[in-house]
Every structure is written in C-alpha cells, then in structure tokens.
Amino acid sequence: MGPTTNNLHAEVMSPGDFDLLSGFISSRCGIKLPPAKKTMLEGRLRKRLRSLGLDNFAAYCDYLFSQGGLEDEGVHMVDMVTTNKTDFFREPQHFHFLTQKALPELTQKLGWGSREKRLKVWSAGCATGEEPYTLAMFLREFGGASADFHFSILATDISTRALEKARLAIYEHEAIEPVPLPWRKKYLLRSKDKDKNLIRIAPELRSLVHFRTLNFMDDNYRIREPQEIIFCRNVLIYFNRPTQLAVLKRLCRHLRPGGYLFIGHSETLHGLDLPLGQCAPTIYRKT
C-alpha cells in the first residue's frame, strides 16, 4: 500500500539523505544545493515518493542507488530539481544587440546566413522553449521575405520533461504577452477550443528549431559544427565557479572565432580565463 499524503507531508529528509541526494544532483547535473535548500528538495521529491509508493526519503535513496535505480529514476530526479523558469523576449536588450549588431556583423561582413554558410544558433539550457522560439522570430524577421537567409537553431536542455513541452510548443496565453501583436498574428496560433486560453507556435517556426537532450556536465557535447551564436542565459548561476569555468570552456570549444556568447544579466565572467572579449554587458565575442 502506498503512503498517505499526511505521512508524506510529515516525513522529513534526514541530513544524511540530503547529503546523498545533493551529491548525486551535483555530480549528475552540476547544480549545487546548500543545506538551506533541503526543504525545497523535500517538496519537489514528495511527488516522486507518491508515484513510487515509497514511505520515506531513506527508501527513495535506497531505490535511487540500487542496481538499475539510477538508470530508471535519474531522469525523473533531474526533472524534479531543475528550474525551467523562462519567458518569451526575456532580457530584451540581448535581442536588440542581436539584430542591431551581431547579425549585421556576422551576415554582411562575414557572409554567414548564405546557403553555403548557414548561420548556426544554439540555445543552451532552453528549458520549455520560449528562448529558441523567440530567437526564431527575430531571425525570421531579420531575414525578412528573403529566401536567401539560411539559419538553424539548436535548442538543448537536460530536462526531458521541459523538452517535451518545448517540442509541443503550447503555452498559456499570458506567456505570449511580451510578443508584439504583429508577430503574434504571424507566428502564433490560437486554440480552436475557446474555453482553453492556449496558443501554439506556428509550424513554420517550430520547423526551424531542433531540440535535443544535453547535459552540461558531459565532456563531449556531440555538436559537430561550430556555432556562430550561443545563448546560455541564467544557467551558470546554478553552478559553482569551477563548474562554471569548465562549462564555459566547453561552450567556447563550440563557438566559432568571431561568434557571440550571451549570458544572463545576473551572471559574470569576471576573472575567468577564457578566449572571450566583452562587447556589451553580458555579451561576449570569441577572439
């Protein structure tokens, strides 16, 4: 018999169980959870305890670290602890720089965006898809009606649950409020069910974004072609400084010289030895 809701709410994670679970989270996806986050972790994992019919967190640890447990439960664990908060048109200064500076430089001066030199953009840590779809809108608008502007968008995240929503591309109507009205008419579809206040990204835009799973902790990201633009925003804040440096070095390996890296406005590369020059706040170019 599964545990009752009352039992689960009364159950408290022991310091030892927290150490085991936070250590696993750190090694699996780089996220550091200080002891102050124990209550948060308890809250997020209670749903998994209910689903598995487990009475307490000690039993969950036994299951997670059992033979086959890591493979079966590891994905769910990551989904529970990763934060997928994002928005359309988040940090709009980045998109202004993208269209006014970065794209003209890359296309007009360096020739990217032609059929032979397709412009490659990577949304690293894309969560539920708002960022890559925003990028697709700006890139489509930058190219205008021209059929000669060629680009691709790679969007990656560690959370399979977030990627499922991103591929589905269905959002609450409130989420698209930052999108300009003319763009809504071009790129968004209203639900046919008037009782559902939902929108979906139009097929034309969905076809421009390729989603796949990627763990920043992996040594090899399996990205064959160098990218001209990388957006990795509000990801580094979850890592400690050594992990940030390791991840940024891997990102730089996949960024073409002269390409642009965009990070979140609460993040900094100050003091890190990287082949990047700052060209605006939180915007860098590979040297």
Write out the residue ranges for each language-model feature:
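Conserved AdoMet
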Residues: 2-120, 264
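Extended basic-aromatic, gly/pro-enriched interface segments that bind polyanionic ligands
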Residues: 124, 145-231, 235-243, 268-270
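Conserved SAM-binding loop of SAM-dependent methyltransferases across substrates and taxa
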Residues: 128-146
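Core SAM-dependent methyltransferase catalytic element
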Residues: 229, 270-287
